[in-house]
Amino acid sequence: QTDTDSNSEGDETPAEEDVNLQTLEISFDRTCQFACSYCNPAFSTSWVKDIKNNGRYEQLTSDGRNHFTHIHESSQLYGYQEDNPYIEAFWKWWESDLHKTLQELRVTGGEPLMSADMWKLFDWFKDNHGKSNMRLAINSNLGGKDALIDKLIQKAQHVEHFHLYTSCEAIFDQAEYIRDGLVWSTWTKNVDRVCAEGNLEGFHMMCTVNALCLFSLTDFLDYCLELKSKYGKDFPTFTLNILRFPSFQSPLIL
C-alpha cells in the first residue's frame, strides 16, 4: 500500500513517480520451531526437516500446490551464514528513509523471534528513540521458552506502537495436535505475560478455521473472551479465517 492510495477519485499518479509505502510486510527467513499442520516448508524449517528426514508425503491428491512433496528451496535462497543481498537492501532502505515514511512494518516468518534481524530491528528502536512513529507488528507463535519471552518483553519497552499477532484456534490437546510444537500451558502462560508486561498497543489472535478445530473452536473463543475481561476489550482482537488450502483440511470436507 502506498501514500497515493488515499487520493481522491480521479487523481492519477504518473507511473514513473516515486511513492512512499504506507505498509510493508517482510520475512527475514523461515526459521521456525513449529510444524503446524496447515503450514508447509516454505514457511517453516521444522517442516523442511521433516521432509528431509522422512521423505515426501505421498498420495495427497487434494494438495494442488504440492506443498508437502518438496522442501521449497526457492523460499530460502541464501544460507543462514551467507550474506543476503535482499536483507542488506532492506536495511539500507530502512536507514535512509523507510523508517520515516512507513505507517506500519509487519514482520512475519518463520518465527521472527528466531531471527537475528528481528532483534536488530528492536535494537534500532531502542537506539533511535523518537525517530520513527510507525507501528511495528510481528507474527509470533509465542511458543518460546521463558528467556526468549523475557527478551521480547524487554525489547518491546522501546517500541512506542507495538502490535503482536499470534495464532491458535483450539484448546489443550487439540491445539497441540493441529500446531505441532505448541505446548498449550506454555503458550497460554506466554500470552498472559505479553498482555501484562509487553508494552503492547495491540494484541491480535488469528484463528484458522479448519476441519480439526471445529469441536473446540467455541471453547477457544471463550478463552479469548476471558482474556478480554482480564486485559481489556481489545486484548485480544481476533479474526476467523476459513482455511482453503490444504483442501484436505478444509472444514468443508466434513
Explain the meaning of each model-derived region.
Residues 1-22, 34, 38, 42-45:
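Flexible, acidic/Gly-rich N-terminal and inter-domain linker regions that tether
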Residues 21-31, 42-86, 100-116, 128-148, ...:
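Core AdoMet radical
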Residues 7-17, 82-96, 146:
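A Trp-anchored, charged/polar loop motif used as the substrate-binding/catalytic surface
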Residues 119-123, 146-155, 216-218:
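Distinct, well-ordered alpha-helical segments
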Residues 211-227:
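Catalytic cores of alpha/beta
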Residues 124-130, 197-198:
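Short, acidic, metal-binding catalytic loop of nucleotide-sugar glycosyltransferases
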Residues 24, 90-93, 121, 187-190, ...:
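Alpha-helical packing segments of well-folded alpha/beta enzyme cores
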